[in-house]
Amino acid sequence: MDTTTTATQMLHLPSLPVLLSFLLFLLMLIRYWKNSNGQGKQPPGPKPLPILGNLHQLADGQPHHVMTKLCRKYGPVMKLKLGQLDAVIISSPEAAKEVLKTNEIKFAQRPEVYAVEIMSYDHSSIVFAPYGDYWREMRKISVLELLSNKRVQSFRSIREDEVWGLVEFISSNQGRPINLSEKIFTMTNDIIARAAFGRKNSDQHNFTVLLEEIMKIGAGFAIADLYPSLTFLRPLTGVKPALMRIQKKMDKILEDIVAEHKLKRKAAANNNVKLEEEDLVDTLLNYAEATNKNEFHLTIDQVKAVTLDIFSAGSETSATSMEWAMSELLKNPRVMKKAQEEVRQACKGKSKIQEADIQKLDYLKLVIKETFRLHAPGPFTPREAREKCEIRGYTIPAKAKILINLHAIGRDPTVWKDPECFRPERFEGSSTDFKGNHFELIPFGGGRRICPGISFATANIELGLAQLMYHFDWKLANGERLEDLDMSENFGMTARRKENLQVIATTRIPFEK
């Protein structure tokens, strides 16, 4: 090789520092181009760690509490890396409105949750079904048939009967400690069982225990949900075998319920008589047994999925809200006294309250609103971005997991004066409701995926609280002081009390058995 030529070529090559500087500049230019043209303006958030993302920060407490603290620092649209997932936390009414109303089609999808995939018969439930034709049909059936206002009113006698059973139990145990949490959950489960299945079920206790296990696992923060690509981890964490065990037991109970209904329907058809009363399972079986090819048709697995949906969502929402309302009333005796005086004056002379009496109880309704503000039944309303879009000027990538933090919105000091104070009077003269129209108060979500069971849950809560306020005076059991009442939550698909509410009741208004 000609050494002169080689030396001349080397003189024309850039030096190593110059080359590295150029490459670094090019890399920064590419990254800037991606941010400005590809990803757009990203929501702020704490810096994630490799592999973990921001999961280490959630270890400091309940996820919705930690996220509330973080949003006060980073803003109402905050980005978190949860394992492999891109999550955007929404913590203001304005941002929630953009998700649930302005861009509701773009956020009409529910994020995939591993527990739900197994338990809901391949996403056949109303709550978690993918946005599409099946979900639209089921939504229509829910709103017009299963949980319409007319149908909810048809369950009035069931509600009154089961609430009265609770009143009788408390009266027969007055002066003794009562696990009110347990009794409230039993009451709401009995209401749902009779509405959905036609009667209380012998397997109901087992059904409820299995539901509680699902609620703990199905919050979306399991390893399988945070690292969806690492499928080999699922058996190792123990979640998959636990879910399969629960699903097998739950399916057997649901299969028996469906089989019993089929026998009842067949007997009625053979005798050429119409069923006296159709419960919710009967309504679903009408679609499973449809013979017209043009009619919407359900499989038996879909019937079971929707039945499970109704039972779990209905009982948990009503019971959790009643439990928190009673907790706040005990913690705030001024409010309890005012609620008791209202119902005792409005229903004076009556031995029991009828559902028609509820319309007179304006202050009780304010108590329920205030309970929903501080204690939404579920801490988050989850969504998934179906496509790339913008929220409050920030670019949200397709497939991003959206968590609307109801805990943060209910305690936002820019929206609510003294947000930690339980003060129902804040809603006096206000048009704010909880039916998805006012995004500062959305315990049931909003938009087209709003919970269809609002009327059903509200009716249970109103009648239950009215009877408890009317007939009894209350105090905490075991000599516990009001200021020492533990108001901690358990985190799951719902946010129940961490400790059961233990109380002592004294009959104030006598009644006829």
Curated annotation (Swiss-Prot):
Molecular function terms, GO-annotated: heme binding; iron ion binding; monooxygenase activity; oxidoreductase activity, acting on paired donors, with incorporation or reduction of molecular oxygen
Tissue distribution: Accumulates in mature fruits and in juice vesicles.
Assigned keywords, A-Z: Heme, Iron, Membrane, Metal-binding, Monooxygenase, Oxidoreductase, Transmembrane, Transmembrane helix
Metabolic or biological pathway: Secondary metabolite biosynthesis; terpenoid biosynthesis
Catalytically driven reaction(s): dihydroniloticin + 2 reduced [NADPH--hemoprotein reductase] + 2 O2 = melianol + 2 oxidized [NADPH--hemoprotein reductase] + 3 H2O + 2 H(+)
Record EC number: 1.14.14.-
Residues passing through the membrane, by range: 10-30
Function: Monooxygenase involved in the biosynthesis of limonoids triterpene natural products such as limonin, a compound with insecticidal activity responsible for the bitter taste in citrus. Catalyzes the conversion of dihydroniloticin to the protolimonoid melianol.
Compartment(s): Membrane
Domain of life according to the entry: Eukaryota
Cofactor requirements of the protein: heme
Signal sequence region: none
Principal location listed in the UniProt entry: membrane
Membrane topology, from the record: Single-pass membrane protein
UniProt-annotated binding residues for heme: C451
Single GO cellular component term: membrane
Protein name, entry field: Melianol synthase CYP71BQ4
Lineage: Eukaryota, Viridiplantae, Streptophyta, Embryophyta, Tracheophyta
